[in-house]
């Protein structure tokens, strides 16, 4: 009988990317609308890519078994 493959979590695949060095990168949410009350600093920091902390990386990588 064939081995059952792990399915990729599509929610995670759409939001996260594994970099060449193995870090997990994502984009910060909450900067697309309702921006008038947010400071320039807060909006600027929202454009920068964010990285998943090292202690949670293994959990996230389990959701992305095929490195989507």
From Swiss-Prot:
Ordered alphabetically, the record's keywords are: Ribonucleoprotein, Ribosomal protein
Positions of the region Disordered? 29-68
Instruction: Indicate, by first and last residue, each region the UniProt record lists as having compositional bias (Basic residues).
Output: 35-47
A GO CC term assigned to this protein in UniProt:
cytosolic large ribosomal subunit
S-S bridge residues: none
GO biological-process terms attached to the record: translation
Please provide, alphabetically and separated by semicolons, the GO molecular function terms listed in this UniProt record: structural constituent of ribosome
Belongs to which family? Belongs to the bacterial ribosomal protein bL35 family.
Name this protein carries in UniProt:
Large ribosomal subunit protein bL35
Q: Which gene encodes it?
A: rpmI
């Amino acid at each position: 009988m064939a081995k059952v493959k792990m399915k990729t979590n599509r929610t995670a695949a759409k939001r996260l990317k594994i970099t060449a060095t193995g870090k997990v990168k994502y984009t910060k949410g909450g900067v697309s609308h309702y921006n008038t009350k947010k400071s320039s600093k807060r909006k600027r920091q929202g454009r920068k890519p964010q990285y998943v902390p090292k202690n949670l990386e293994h959990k996230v990588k389990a959701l992305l078994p095929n490195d989507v």
